[in-house]
From Swiss-Prot:
The gene is rps16. Disulfide bonds: none annotated. It is found in: Plastid, Chloroplast. It comes from Phaeodactylum tricornutum (strain CCAP 1055/1). GO terms for molecular function: structural constituent of ribosome. PROSITE patterns: RIBOSOMAL_S16 (PS00732). This is Small ribosomal subunit protein bS16c. Belongs to the bacterial ribosomal protein bS16 family. The keyword Ribosomal protein applies. Coiled coil: none annotated.
């Protein structure tokens, strides 16, 4: 089952994340099917490709709880 997930990048104690489409059984830092944006919790910056996210959501891909809250803050989903 495919999911919209966060993939951790960055250094130790300085996390940043990429929003990706991955198989739900894949490792957290495994190879994604597609990258859709990034999120930096320290600087509170994010950038998402809205068209690609909506395309994947239309295909039936489920976001995780954290990704859902980020997409609501970005007003991509309601």
């Amino acid at each position: 089952m495919l999911k919209l997930r966060l993939k951790r990048t960055g250094r130790k104690r300085s996390p940043s994340y990429r929003l990706v489409v991955m198989e739900n059984t894949a490792r957290r830092d495994g190879r994604p099917i597609e990258e859709l944006g990034y999120y930096s919790p320290i600087t509170k910056q994010y950038k998402f490709d809205v068209e690609k996210i909506k395309k994947w959501l239309d295909f039936g891909v489920k976001p995780t709880e954290t990704v859902s809250s980020l997409l609501r803050k970005a007003e991509i989903i309601s």
